[in-house]
Amino acid sequence: MTYSIMKLIELMGDQFPLLLNTLLERMPVIVAGEDIEIVDDITESLTTLCPHRHKLVFWRDFTSESEIVSVWEEEKHNYEVSRTIVCGLSGNLRLAMDRISHFAGWILAVPLGFTVLGVQVTESTLQDVTAHVLKNSGNCGLLRVSSPSAITFSLVRPSDSSLDVEKKIVNKILVRKKQSLERIRRLLTKSLRGLDVSNHILTAVLKLDDESEKLTQDVFEEEINNYVHAARRAVTLLSRIRLARELGASTTLTERNLYEAIGWDGGELPDLIQFIRAEWHEDFSDCVKSGALSGLGAWVDSMWGT
C-alpha cells in the first residue's frame, strides 16, 4: 500500500475528516477510478484509518453474506471481539454485487473502464453499485480517483456529524508531527555543529521523510485508540445506566458527567452516541441528556472507585 495516512491527509485536505468519520461510523465507501491498481491500492489503504478493526478481504477471508453476518452477530453479543472492516477489491466487484446485500463497514473498489468477470464497468455501473449499496445502508461515501494525486470524497446524503473529533485528530497529528520533527532537526543540527560538512550531506541528514510518515502513523493510531477506548468506557457505563433504568430507576446521565467519567473532552455527544451505535450495535441515546441530575455524579464516581 502506497497511500499512507500522511499522504491521504495531504491529498484530501478538508475532506479527510469527513472520510474518517464515514469509516468510523462504518458507512460503506465506494472507491471509483480508471486506474485499477490505484483504486485497489487506495481501497486497501483506507483500512489503515481504522487501526482498531480487523480487516477482512472479500473472496479471500469470506465468500458469502452468511459468513460476514455471523461475524456481525458475534460482535453484537460480545463487546470484546474485534470489530471488522471489509475490503472488496476490483476483481471481485461482480461477485460482491451478486452475493452481498448489506455493505456496512465495506470499502468497495469500482474500476471504471475495466471488464470484471465479463461486466464492463462504466459510470452507469457505478450508479447501479451505489443504488445496490444504499438499499440497506442509510448513507454511502464516494471517493473518486482522477489521478494518483487527485482524490475527492463526498457522501451521497448529507451528514449530521460535527466532525469535531476527526478535525481534532488531524490537528493533533499536524502539531505533534511538526514539534517532533523540529526537535529531531535541532538535535541533528547541534550534533553536526563545528564539523566540515557539505550542504548536500547536511540536507541528506536533515531529510526526515520516513520519520515524518512514521510519526504520522503513530500519532494517528494513538488518537484513534484513545477515542475508541473512551467510547468503550462509555459503553460500560451506559449499559449500567440502562440496567438501572430497567430495574425502575428514572435517572439518566448528563453529558458532562459522562465525559468526566470516561476521561474524554472532545466532540459532540450525538457523534459519540453514533460511533457507539456503529461500533457496538448499541443505542444509548435515551441514557444521556443535558442538564444536572441530583446525586448521579456521586453514583458514577462510585462505579469507578473514586
Set out the residue ranges of the language-model regions:
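Extended amphipathic alpha-helical scaffold segments
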Residues: T2-H77
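A eukaryote-biased sequence property
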Residues: T48, L56, F62-T306
